[in-house]
Amino acid sequence: MSLRKQTPSDFLKQIIGRPVVVKLNSGVDYRGVLACLDGYMNIALEQTEEYVNGQLKNKYGDAFIRGNNVLYISTQKRRM
């Protein structure tokens, strides 16, 4: 049985519509539902919250984040 290796592109396709954390180069975190992204890592989030130093600073309905500012994207566990 051979296991297929998952590429970063595969991972990103799988998490569309799920809660994510987007960490920027500046250290700011955006948490929300991943609406879409492109090959340049430009990201559209829904139900977005902005965290600075771990503290909630703002809430946005929709947010667009330019890809060159993104340090990483990770999945976020759903809140109960």
Curated annotation (Swiss-Prot):
Nucleotidyltransferase as UniProt keyword: no
Biological processes per GO annotation: maturation of SSU-rRNA; mRNA catabolic process; mRNA splicing, via spliceosome; RNA splicing; tRNA processing
UniProt modified residues of type N6-acetyllysine: K59
Transmembrane segments: none
Gene3D superfamilies: 2.30.30.100
All copies of domain Sm, residue ranges: 7-79
Gene Ontology cellular-component terms listed: cytoplasm; cytosol; Lsm2-8 complex; nucleolus; nucleoplasm; nucleus; P-body; small nuclear ribonucleoprotein complex
Keywords on record: Acetylation, Cytoplasm, mRNA processing, mRNA splicing, Nucleus, Ribonucleoprotein, RNA-binding, rRNA processing, Spliceosome, tRNA processing
Annotated InterPro entries: Lsm6/sSmF, LSM_dom_sf, Sm, Sm_dom_euk/arc
Family, as annotated: Belongs to the snRNP Sm proteins family. SmF/LSm6 subfamily.
PANTHER family, per database record: SMALL NUCLEAR RIBONUCLEOPROTEIN F SNRNP-F, U6 SNRNA-ASSOCIATED SM-LIKE PROTEIN LSM6
Protein name listed in UniProt: U6 snRNA-associated Sm-like protein LSm6
Source organism: Homo sapiens (Human)
Gene from which this protein is expressed: LSM6
